[in-house]
Amino acid sequence: MSNGFIVQIIGAVVDIEFPQDAVPQVYDAVKVVSEGQGQGLVLEVQQQIGGGVVRCITMGSSDGLRRGLEVMNSGKSIQVPVGVSTLGRIMNVLGEPIDEKGPIGEEERWSIHRAAPSYEDQSNSNDLLETGIKVIDLVCPFAKGGKVGLFGGAGVGKTVNMMELIRNIAIEHSGYSVFAGVGERTREGNDFYHEMMESNVLDKVSLVYGQMNEPPGNRLRVALTGLTMAEKFRDEGRDVLFFVDNIYRYTLAGTEVSALLGRMPSAVGYQPTLAEEMGVLQERITSTRTGSITSVQAVYVPADDLTDPSPATTFAHLDATVVLSRQIAALGIYPAVDPLDSTSRQLDPLVVGKEHYETARGVQTVLQRYKELKDIIAILGMDELSEEDKLTVARARKIERFLSQPFFVAEVFTGSPGKYVPLKETIRGFQGILKGEYDDLPEQAFYMVGSIDEVVEKSKKL
């Protein structure tokens, strides 16, 4: 392979000139070989712009780069370690260990750019994945091998919800998981690592981090690195869980480099290739006949606007959407899941059964009626309502509070022990409220408890 030389540097985007007969292909990895600062830096080819020049994105800081530095073409795309040796380790976008525990010791490396499984190879299942979180299991149940989005603005609990899901599923489900931290806070990555360690599930999780302080190249590719590791577990015939926090930062990293790559911005300043970039990632997150990938993705919603192009593009790919609401968080109800806005393809009587379906729809009907009555209550007060509506409001307020739940990962700051509620218990509790079996209990008893039996116990102490 002939070497090339850097001819232009604009932030994270670098132009490199190669001999005309040895131009690297798009997505090839190239490496700075000149001695000094910047040596060993890996770049990924994005465009061939003619005259032997290729435009690349750096997979690290471009500090210390200068024109004229020599660059070697590896002749292949970025390769990362896969397999059981990655479990319990923290790696960066290139699959290099960053946890100071020595080399990964992998037997195999895979390219991060891979084709999605063909239509014939794909399979879907209607098995439910129990999470132990009441509101999710009831209103927007997850499918095994499905895709779930956690939508929410800043500070409504996406990461805490995700950590609780990982903890519950890792302990109860005991499969392998891959966690990709895409452009999130390093502190959260650190908290997560220690949380997994304390729960004794670290040896079942591979962690890949490209956090907020990293250049856009890392944040753009780290989701693919994590996905490649998950695909390896799937192709070995396992059921693997793939967590991404946060998919919005993946889009944002693409936006940051898009203009530097010479593309015209589209709606709201996003890259024109937004739908394609999202599709390339999401189409690979799928289940095949050999194994399944169940993915949970946190999606930041800019300014709480669900019609923003980034969350709107993500919606199309998901089987279940868990929408976190600032209004519900303001009431002090956590998890702040909006039961009227959250959806799931699994909420179908043919999949979840008639009992579950009718309970979930009954809960939504009562909450929707309460929402409609709120304006009347605000203007005229409760006394103007009919007896039937008064009963609906009382039950709705109990349901709202019963949808809250203490989390294991939040024990430190709530002071109450976490609760895992089996689906049967969840359905039994909400059915009881809808039938009026608990009309005599005060609504405070329903707040921050697990099963309905705890409500009865709590009401005796009030």
From Swiss-Prot:
InterPro entries: AAA+_ATPase, ATP-synt_VA_C, ATP_synth_F1_bsu, ATPase_a/bsu_AS, ATPase_alpha/beta_chains, ATPase_F1/V1/A1_a/bsu_N, ATPase_F1/V1/A1_a/bsu_N_sf, ATPase_F1/V1/A1_a/bsu_nucl-bd. Keywords: ATP synthesis, ATP-binding, Cell inner membrane, Cell membrane, CF(1), Hydrogen ion transport, Ion transport, Membrane, Nucleotide-binding, Translocase, Transport. It is a peripheral membrane protein. GO terms for molecular function: ATP binding; ATP hydrolysis activity; proton-transporting ATP synthase activity, rotational mechanism. Its EC number is 7.1.2.2. ATP binds at G152, G153, A154, G155, V156, G157, K158, T159. Its main location: membrane. The keyword Cell membrane applies. GO terms for cellular component: plasma membrane; proton-transporting ATP synthase complex. It is found in: Cell inner membrane. It catalyses: ATP + H2O + 4 H(+)(in) = ADP + phosphate + 5 H(+)(out). The keyword Transmembrane helix does not apply. It comes from the Bacteria. PROSITE patterns: ATPASE_ALPHA_BETA. It holds the Pfam family ATP-synt_ab_N. Disulfide bonds: none annotated. Produces ATP from ADP in the presence of a proton gradient across the membrane. The catalytic sites are hosted primarily by the beta subunits. F-type ATPases have 2 components, CF(1) - the catalytic core - and CF(0) - the membrane proton channel. CF(1) has five subunits: alpha(3), beta(3), gamma(1), delta(1), epsilon(1). CF(0) has three main subunits: a(1), b(2) and c(9-12). The alpha and beta chains form an alternating ring which encloses part of the gamma chain. CF(1) is attached to CF(0) by a central stalk formed by the gamma and epsilon chains, while a peripheral stalk is formed by the delta and b chains. Belongs to the ATPase alpha/beta chains family. This is ATP synthase subunit beta. The lineage of its organism: Bacteria, Pseudomonadati, Pseudomonadota, Gammaproteobacteria, Aeromonadales.
